[in-house]
Amino acid sequence: MKKILLTGLAALFLLAGWFLAGRDERPAPALPDDPLEIGVEADVEPFSYVGLRGELTGFDVEFAREVCRELHRECRIEPMAFAALLPSLKAGELDLVVAGLAETKKRRVDFLFSEPYYRSGSFFVTTQKRFEHFTPDRIPELVIGVQEGKLQDEYVAEHYVPRGARKKTYSSFDALVDALLSGEVNMIFLDSVPGYTLLNHPRGEALFIGGRAENDDAEFTACRVAAKRGDVPLIEGVNRTLHKLQSNGKFQDLIIRFLPFFSF
């Protein structure tokens, strides 16, 4: 069954590649020759982290490098706290942010977004078995940790704090996990891709999934690259890179190499 599914996926990717290749026959717009300054989130596996040989790697990092290759520009990849990424892009310190961003009405005021390059839901993780399947009446017992500036931060503030939960924010993924393991919070709410990576890591041996977001709609799960509003040629270059990688199989290679599951 798995072999049939993967073969079917490969066929779909190939057909998509033929379609997209035809769509992209028009000449690409001229782009500057200076280096591309690309922001990624620091220290969050499997997206951006320091490998065993001391090199910066990860799904977002390698996708960013492919964008630079497609646009024939030198790459300067800047790992930073997630909450600093969009302000740095808005200030002109970055050209792109490759960090699995959701496109929201608020963000569209200042930024332009690519097509989704992967999809990911969100779930709660806990150390306490009693919260593994919590019900709405237990929400006032929750102290929920979230990462500052992420969509999960906004979601908890909107859906759980008004119902009695307490929210604590942390500047990094590691700080968020440390807060859960130390008992500072009894639940964290995070992206499912690094969440599954955590659960398969020795640090996650005593952790449980404590439920999913109540509303995993398309806006909440589609993950995109961002540029400054108006930078259409650059976003078109990102989309062109995505189409090319999907059609030649390299994107699937990146998924198999870094992600715990197919995520489209």
List the predicted regions and their residue ranges.
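Beta->alpha turn/N-cap motifs
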Residues: 39-44, 78-83, 92-104, 127, ...
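Extracytoplasmic small-molecule ligand-binding "clamshell" domains
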Residues: 24-101, 109, 169
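Ligand-binding clefts/hinges and TM-proximal coupling segments of bilobed small-molecule sensing domains
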Residues: 15-22, 151-170, 206-210, 239-264
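A ligand-binding cleft/hinge motif common to bilobed small-molecule-binding domains
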Residues: 84-87, 100-110, 157-158, 182, ...
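Ligand-binding cleft/hinge of the Venus flytrap
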Residues: 48-51, 64-73, 135-138, 151-172, ...
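Flexible hinge/capping segments at coil-to-helix
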Residues: 126-144
